[in-house]
Design a protein with these regions (language model features):
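Short Gly/Pro-enriched turn/cap motifs at secondary-structure boundaries
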Residues: 58-61, 141-142, 177, 240-244
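Glycine-rich phosphate/pyrophosphate-binding beta-alpha loops
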Residues: 147, 202, 267-281
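Phosphate-binding site of ATP-dependent enzymes
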Residues: 151-234, 255-262
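Conserved metal-phosphate-binding beta-hairpin within the catalytic cores
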Residues: 177, 186-188, 241-272, 282
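Cysteine/selenocysteine-centered motifs that mediate thiol-based redox chemistry or coordinate metal-sulfur cofactors
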Residues: 292-300
């Protein structure tokens, strides 16, 4: 029996609900015995055994921080995607970027701050001096997804507006260098890279509106010469190995004007709505949504 866990309590709940429903209907169409459980209110670990399989469709901390995976591993219940250690490596952007840097995988320069509002209060006018070498930055929560509370920062006024707009400015954030870029993502399925997808949007970057609101965002197959394609895939597979990921994941990157690649982050539970990046990439090589779901639950 397969259980799809969806929902959760994070800011990505609505996305998770859509992903979970699409996965559930796909599994039903494939002939599996399947149930949907809204996590955590209807989830009790005691109801599962080693004969069960959990498809984790939870985005944000509920499904990607590693806590749920740890519980399932202790109970020896099989589940989709990476184990708890890999999730812990990828969930915190500072931890992830430190691992990338340690293993010589290119990633934009960054500064980690434990509390955004406290940092602003302590630094006052000195703040921009600290970040001056970066020219322009992205402000991102150290732990969150779907581009929630992500802002482009060019000056102190931008920072003040970002702090005012944040859902929670007392948590940890990173300031990340803005690379002159193309934005792209590479899904990985069972140890092989699916076609890279380039993201084009009229927004200043691929923010929440670009992902879920605006209709003009384009997801295009990212065409590269063979040598650059091989380089990109090597970077992504090395990233997967360094983080300890397995099964399915998505590596988000930038390409600068000199055609260099930079890894931004790793998603251990990628979006699985019918219009998400992962299914779009799979579709471009003839892998239907149902085929993709079937392969995810059969990856090792």
């Amino acid at each position: 029996k397969i259980t799809v866990l969806y929902g959760g309590q994070s800011s990505e709940r609505e996305v998770s609900l859509e992903s979970g429903k699409d996965i559930y209907h796909s599994l039903k169409a494939l002939g599996y015995e399947v149930q949907l459980i809204d996590y955590p209110k209807n989830f009790f670990i005691e109801q599962f055994s080693q004969e069960d399989f959990i498809f984790i469709a939870l985005h944000g901390a509920d499904g990607e921080s590693g806590e749920l995976q740890k519980i399932l591993q202790q109970k020896r219940v099989l589940f989709s995607g990476s184990d708890h250690k890999a999730c812990m490596n990828t969930w915190n952007k500072n931890t992830c970027k430190n691992l990338l840097k340690k293993n010589n995988i290119p990633t934009p320069k960054w500064i980690n701050v434990s509390s955004l509002i406290a940092m602003q209060r302590n630094l006052e006018d000195d703040f921009f001096d600290l970040l001056r070498p970066f020219k322009e930055l992205f402000l991102k929560p150290a732990e969150d997804g779907s581009s929630i509370d992500v802002f482009k920062i060019s000056n102190n006024k931008d920072l003040e507006l970002a702090i005012e707009s944040c859902i929670n400015s007392s948590r940890a954030f990173i300031f990340e260098e803005n690379v002159d870029f193309k934005e792209l993502t590479v899904p990985i399925l069972n140890g092989r890279c699916l076609p890279a997808v380039e993201i084009r949007t009229s927004e200043s970057f691929y923010n929440f509106n670009a992902k879920y609101v605006n209709k003009d965002t384009q997801l295009l197959e990212f065409i590269l010469p063979n040598d650059k394609k091989n380089e990109l895939e090597e970077i992504c597979l090395k990233t997967m190995d360094v983080m300890g990921c397995r099964g399915w994941l998505r590596v988000d990157l930038l390409q600068d004007k000199n055609n260099n690649f930079y890894v931004l982050e790793v998603n251990t539970v990628p979006g699985m709505t019918s219009h998400s990046l992962f299914p779009k990439s799979a579709e471009s090589i003839g892998l239907s949504y149902n085929d993709l779901v079937n392969e995810i639950i059969n990856t090792k």
